[in-house]
Regions:
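Long, contiguous binding/interaction regions
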Residues: 1-45, 49-158
Length: 158
């Protein structure tokens, strides 16, 4: 079972290390992690995606709530959230492939953000599943470099 943890923490040095070590010490894998300052510069929000049994995920939530620097922990399932990832992919291409790459970008709403005669950098912001599918679509063009953010997520509006 996959769970998204949205953790508000004090925005200070060492907090990320403390939270990630909680997962490591207990043998839980962090599948995705993003951290950023909120509208309040004294608070950061960590979005952590992890999988495990319902008991394990409940234990993670309890342990997070015990941390001094943790202000609030919210958990939700993927279907209860709006989530996005950003990916930058540098691909090699030849002139004959250019129209196919442009078509893929139009279909997926990806952008071509940089180009030379032999390389292109593509940008996509979408759901994690669609980002995975996009990667599968562009693999055939010889991926030179790929950089992907972790999941950003918020609970859906009620």
């Amino acid at each position: 079972m996959k769970r998204i943890f949205s953790v508000s923490v004090e925005n200070r040095s060492g907090v990320l290390s403390k939270v990630s070590s909680l997962f490591a010490r207990r043998g839980y894998n962090i599948e995705s992690l993003t951290v950023g300052e909120t509208h309040d510069p004294t608070i950061s929000n960590m979005t952590i995606v992890s999988s495990g049994s319902p008991r394990d995920l409940e234990q993670i939530e309890k342990q997070l709530n015990k941390k001094l620097d943790v202000i609030k922990v919210r958990t939700f399932k993927e279907e209860e959230s709006v989530s996005r990832e950003v990916i930058l992919v540098k691909i090699k291409y030849v002139a004959q492939n250019r129209s196919e790459i442009i078509e893929i970008c139009q279909i997926t709403k990806a952008e071509i953000v940089d180009t030379t005669d032999t390389n292109m950098i593509l940008l996509l912001c979408d759901t994690p599943d669609r980002v995975d599918k996009f990667i599968d679509m562009v693999k055939k063009f010889n991926i030179v470099e790929l950089d992907r953010t972790g999941t950003l997520a918020m609970k859906k509006c009620k």
